[in-house]
């Protein structure tokens, strides 16, 4: 049987991305369905999560599925030395699909190769976060009316930020111009800049974060500096507040600008920005429900036509 796992957004074609966005739109019209009645969704979170875990579990519940899983690996047999493979094999015997977050880069790929059920990557270390990318794409499409020819500014932790890595790969189909704004310690890794060159993705690098630089942005994608990725806490303290978006910086930006953030926020967006109509990060998080309903259905073989023909409850 075809493995329908979602490990990286790089495996999605342009047509597939647009198909998934249309499916998310259907779920926004009515999120309450019974398309996954009788299915069991396992959520295995080896790292902390609020939005990703809760939105996947809410998506499963709204689709009629049951949810099992854990949020604290210390309370599981992995703390006794059980291997990831054994954990995956055991959970596969209980569930129809596994949503997994893990601290090791490549863990989702490995799980997809050993599991008899589909794996959805809910974040693997500093590597990829494809479900976040799907809701980011949906948010961009909703606010801009297109994914084509946009100026997208990625700000903050571009080294460890798996959300920006996935978004960059997904946007290769839509002729974006990226602006990478990061201190030298957190700049976009060379492998992703090489990816841009291989796919003719335009990008410009900055170390300064000013209102002049962001004046032409369509999307301003803020990220937090991730303390948990640093082995040297002195280095973290040095860079954690390097860029802070303040309301005054938005006065001369484009009318269509929207500010996105994968959340949680720490200090990188001042609270007075929340009331600015260009702030979209809380709506973005809400879009996660619809995008993840689409992901669960697609991975389990339910088509867009099935969703459109489903009786709304």
Swiss-Prot record:
- EC number annotated for this UniProt entry: 2.1.3.2
Kindly name one Pfam family recorded for this protein: OTCace_N
Q: Where does L-aspartate bind?
A: 80, 162, 224
The biological processes this protein is annotated with in GO are: 'de novo' pyrimidine nucleobase biosynthetic process; 'de novo' UMP biosynthetic process; amino acid metabolic process
Judged by the first EC level, this protein's enzyme class is: transferase
Show the catalytic activity: carbamoyl phosphate + L-aspartate = N-carbamoyl-L-aspartate + phosphate + H(+)
**Assigned keywords, A-Z:** Pyrimidine biosynthesis, Transferase
Q: Which InterPro entries match?
A: Asp/Orn_carbamoyltranf_P-bd, Asp/Orn_carbamoylTrfase, Asp/Orn_carbamoylTrfase_sf, Asp_carbamoyltransf, Asp_carbamoyltransf_Asp/Orn-bd
Q: Name one GO molecular function term.
A: amino acid binding
| Superkingdom in the source lineage | Bacteria
Q: Which residues bind carbamoyl phosphate?
A: 51-52, 101, 129, 132, 263-264
**Pathway the protein takes part in:** Pyrimidine metabolism; UMP biosynthesis via de novo pathway; (S)-dihydroorotate from bicarbonate: step 2/3
Record's function text: Catalyzes the condensation of carbamoyl phosphate and aspartate to form carbamoyl aspartate and inorganic phosphate, the committed step in the de novo pyrimidine nucleotide biosynthesis pathway.
Family, according to the entry, reads as follows: Belongs to the aspartate/ornithine carbamoyltransferase superfamily. ATCase family.
Q: How does it assemble?
A: Heterododecamer (2C3:3R2) of six catalytic PyrB chains organized as two trimers (C3), and six regulatory PyrI chains organized as three dimers (R2).
* Record's protein name: Aspartate carbamoyltransferase catalytic subunit
């Amino acid at each position: 049987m075809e493995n329908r796992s979602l490990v990286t957004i790089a495996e999605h074609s342009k047509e597939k991305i647009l198909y998934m966005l249309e499916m998310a739109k259907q779920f926004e019209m009515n999120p309450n369905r019974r398309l996954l009645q009788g299915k069991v969704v396992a959520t295995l979170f080896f790292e902390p999560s609020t939005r990703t875990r809760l939105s996947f579990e809410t998506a499963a519940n709204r689709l009629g599925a049951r949810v099992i899983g854990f949020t604290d690996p210390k309370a599981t047999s992995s703390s006794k030395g059980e291997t990831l493979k054994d954990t995956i094999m055991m959970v596969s015997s209980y569930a129809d699909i596994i949503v997994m977050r893990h601290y090791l880069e490549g863990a989702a790929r490995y799980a997809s190769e050993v599991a008899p059920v589909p794996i959805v990557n809910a974040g693997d270390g500093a590597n990829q976060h494809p479900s976040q990318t799907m809701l980011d794409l949906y948010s961009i499409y909703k606010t801009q009316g297109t994914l084509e020819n946009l100026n997208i500014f990625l700000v903050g932790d571009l080294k460890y930020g798996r959300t920006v890595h996935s978004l960059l790969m997904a946007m290769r189909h839509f002729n974006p111009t990226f602006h990478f704004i990061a201190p030298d310690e957190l700049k976009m890794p060379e492998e992703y800049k090489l990816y841009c060159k291989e796919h003719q993705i335009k990008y410009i690098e900055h170390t300064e974060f000013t209102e002049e630089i962001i004046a032409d942005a369509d999307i301003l994608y803020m990220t937090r500096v991730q303390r948990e990725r640093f082995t040297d806490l002195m280095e973290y303290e040095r860079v954690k507040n390097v860029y802070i978006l303040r309301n005054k910086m938005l006065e001369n930006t484009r009318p269509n600008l929207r500010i996105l953030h994968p959340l949680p926020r720490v200090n990188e967006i001042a609270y007075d920005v929340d009331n600015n109509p260009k702030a979209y990060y809380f709506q973005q998080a809400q879009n996660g429900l619809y995008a993840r309903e689409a992901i669960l259905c697609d991975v389990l073989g339910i088509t867009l036509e099935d969703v459109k023909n489903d009786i709304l409850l």
